[in-house]
Each structure stands twice: as structure tokens, then as C-alpha cells.
């Protein structure tokens, strides 16, 4: 693990243009290969002996994922992402298992390690934020920790703005993992338990304070156009988080109608960012998965939850401009988003979707050959229970 982390540092420094001797880069690549082989061997031995340490496997997945991203190896990055996600889904006992799981389908991962340890909240949140659908892993919570976010009196740098938002998002996802299960989706018919209501109000207040401090920072500190674009990206993710935390505990999805202005802002700002990014892409040297996940998530969020047909289609159309090659490119994810919209609208294309037509708990997996995507979703039947929908979509 140490070798892998050292390799990440050396590779990233060389890509940022810092003085990095060739022998250092060669060493880092050599050590990352050693780390990959060693971690793979350890996990294989654990599987063979039925003694999987989920912490080692998860950390190995996230560290090796980072190395593959820096090397531009999308297939390798997705392999590690799917493996880590599979472990978390197995532990949380939530939703369908993704392809590429570590171990056979009927294998139960060892629970010798405490799955609710505070120190692994960040790792679990990382897998949520790396998935396009932002899978919540409900049930894997921090065992009572409030996961207090960081919010300074004022922001001096854009890094401080980003780090503060990241800490608030981490706190939000830990809160949702602990309290976001179906039995607490009772608003507006019933009040939330006091402990949940207090945590919710505290998070909402923190988000609002962050937004206020961001506005001051933009007015007093931002001078360069590039920094203004980076700040816009953070603003989009704030808007998504604000809608998410404000709707988590509602019994039906009609509540999203109260956030049409936020959905509109998300789409409009995302369009500006993507247009700027596409103009600069030819000279960009930044390593990334082929789908620019920072902008794909907000657009997928709008297509998934908004009921306004025109806004949903604007989001899908712009999503097609995000990324052009590889497995998880904008066009393939847009096909999935379009299927969601068409399935919900049925014969009423372009109109607001009725509650009984909404899809729930949507997850998807794009196959390694990038030709087919498997989509899972739930849909309420006349008895109020969820029927599972399983659909395979052709992507070409």
C-alpha cells in the first residue's frame, strides 16, 4: 500500500510539470507494479481462505484505481472501482451486485473488521462520488459520529473552498448512509425523529453558510477566468447536494418540483463549463477517465430526478458532449439517461411525469466492451411495493 501511494505522488508530480527525474518516474512505475501484484495476491489468498479483510481490499481498490487513472488506463480503473463497489454493496446488503465483483456471487465477505469505523467513511464516500449515479451504500454508517464538516470564517484560496465543500459532502453522505433508508422517507406526512431533524437542519445551515462564503470569495478574490470556471464546478456540485439533502426524507418524488430553479441552474452552469472545457480540451494534459465525472454526475442527476421534460432533455443533450472515447463516455451515459426519461414518460413525452411512473433506485453497469449497458430500477406497483426492472440497452 505504501509503495502504491508513493507511486501516485511521483506520477502526479511528473504530470503537473514539476521537476521529476526520469529515474524517479521509473521507480514509481516499478513500485506501482509491485504494489498491484502484491495486493492482488493478498486479496486472492483471502478469498481462497475465506478471510477477506474488507478494509485492505477497499483501500487497495481505491489506491490502485488512482494509479490506473493517472496512467490513463480506463479498463483497469473500472475493474478496481467495480471490485470496491461490490464489496461495499455486499456489506450494505443494498441493490444488485455489479459485474466484476471480488469473489463468486454467493461469497460473503468477512466482517472481522468493523464496517462502521469512522476512519473508512472517506473511502466509502469516495466510491459514492466516483459513481455516475452516486450510489449511497445505505447502511454503512459511522457508528454515531457526526462527521463535522470544515467551514472556516472566510475563504482565502479556491483550494480552501473545495476542501470545505468536500468535507460537507462527506458529512452529508455519512448522514444519508445512516438515516436514508426507506423507513425514514416519511415527509411531509409525518415529522422526522428529533435526532434526524436536528442533523438535517444543521447540514442545511452549513450548506447555506458555505454558499454565502463562496459568494463573498467570488466577489473579492477571484480574478482569473480559469479560477472562475473551477468555482462554477464547485457551485454545480453544491446545487446537486442541496437538492439531494433537501429531498432525502420525502415519501414521494413530487418534492423535486420545488427545485426547478436549482435544476435549471445546474443545467445552465454545466453548459457554460462544458463549452469552455471543450475549447481547451485539445491542449489539456490532465489525466482522467474518458467521462469527465465532475460534469457528468450533475447532468445525470437532472435527467434522473427532474420532472420538467425540457430540462431533462437539455441535460441529456449536453451530456453527449462530455467525453468522446472509452467505456463511460458522455454519449453512452446519455443513452441510459434517455431510456430513464422515456420509460417514465411513456406515451406522454415531454410532459411532467406522474408519481406512479417514476423509477426508483436506478443503477447501471456498462459492459467492458462498451456495447451494452445493464440497468436496474424499481417501479411501484398497485400494491405500493417495488417491482424490479432489468433492462439491457444497446449502446451502438
Question: Where on the chain are the PLM-derived regions?
Answer:
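Amphipathic alpha-helical protein-interaction segments enriched in hydrophobic
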Residues: 53-61, 225-248, 284-308, 312-313, ...
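Specific register positions within alpha-helical solenoid repeats of the TPR/Sel1-like families, i.e.
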Residues: 10-14, 69, 132, 243-248, ...
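Alpha-helical solenoid repeat scaffolds, predominantly canonical TPR units
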Residues: 31, 38, 80, 262, ...
Amino acid at each position: 500500500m505504501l509503495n502504491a501511494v508513493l507511486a501516485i505522488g511521483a506520477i502526479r508530480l511528473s504530470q503537473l510539470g514539476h521537476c521529476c527525474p526520469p529515474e524517479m518516474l521509473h521507480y514509481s512505475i516499478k513500485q506501482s507494479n509491485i504494489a498491484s501484484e502484491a495486493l492482488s495476491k493478498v486479496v486472492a489468498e483471502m478469498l481462497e481462505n475465506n478471510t477477506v479483510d474488507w478494509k485492505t481490499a477497499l483501500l487497495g481498490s481505491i489506491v490502485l484505481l488512482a494509479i490506473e487513472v493517472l496512467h490513463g488506463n480506463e479498463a483497469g480503473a473500472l475493474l478496481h472501482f467495480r471490485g470496491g463497489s461490490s464489496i461495499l454493496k455486499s456489506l450494505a446488503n443494498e441493490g444488485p451486485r455489479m459485474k466484476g465483483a471480488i469473489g463468486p456471487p454467493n461469497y460473503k465477505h468477512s466482517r472481522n473488521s468493523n464496517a462502521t469505523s469512522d476512519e473508512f467513511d472517506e473511502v466509502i464516500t469516495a466510491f459514492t462520488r466516483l459513481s455516475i449515479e452516486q450510489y449511497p451504500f445505505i447502511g454503512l454508517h459511522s457508528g454515531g459520529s457526526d462527521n463535522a464538516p470544515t467551514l472556516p470564517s472566510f475563504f482565502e484560496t479556491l483550494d480552501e473552498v473545495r476542501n470545505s465543500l468536500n468535507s460537507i459532502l462527506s458529512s452529508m453522505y455519512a448522514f444519508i448512509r445512516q438515516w436514508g433508508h426507506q423507513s425514514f422517507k416519511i415527509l411531509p406526512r409525518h415529522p422526522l425523529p428529533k435526532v434526524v431533524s436536528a442533523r438535517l437542519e444543521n447540514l442545511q445551515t452549513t450548506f447555506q453558510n458555505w454558499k454565502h462564503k463562496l459568494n463573498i470569495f467570488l466577489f473579492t478574490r477571484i480574478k482569473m477566468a480559469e479560477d472562475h470556471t473551477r468555482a462554477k464546478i464547485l457551485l454545480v456540485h453544491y446545487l446537486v447536494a442541496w437538492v439531494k439533502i433537501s429531498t432525502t426524507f420525502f415519501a414521494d418524488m413530487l418534492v423535486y418540483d420545488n427545485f426547478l430553479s436549482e435544476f435549471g441552474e445546474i443545467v445552465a452552469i454545466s453548459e457554460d463549463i462544458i463549452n469552455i472545457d471543450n475549447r481547451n480540451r485539445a491542449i489539456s494534459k490532465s489525466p482522467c477517465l474518458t467521462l469527465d465525472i465532475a460534469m457528468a454526475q450533475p447532468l445525470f442527476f437532472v435527467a434522473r430526478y427532474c420532472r420538467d421534460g425540457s430540462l431533462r432533455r437539455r441535460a441529456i443533450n449536453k451530456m453527449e458532449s462530455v467525453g468522446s472515447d472509452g467505456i463511460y463516455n458522455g454519449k453512452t451515459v446519455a443513452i441510459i439517461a434517455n431510456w430513464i426519461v422515456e420509460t417514465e414518460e411513456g406515451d406522454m413525452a415531454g410532459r411532467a411525469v406522474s408519481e406512479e411512473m417514476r423509477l426508483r433506485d436506478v443503477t447501471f453497469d456498462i459492459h467492458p466492451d462498451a456495447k451494452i449497458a445493464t440497468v436496474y430500477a424499481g417501479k411501484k406497483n398497485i400494491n405500493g411495493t417495488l417491482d424490479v426492472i432489468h433492462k439491457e440497452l444497446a449502446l451502438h
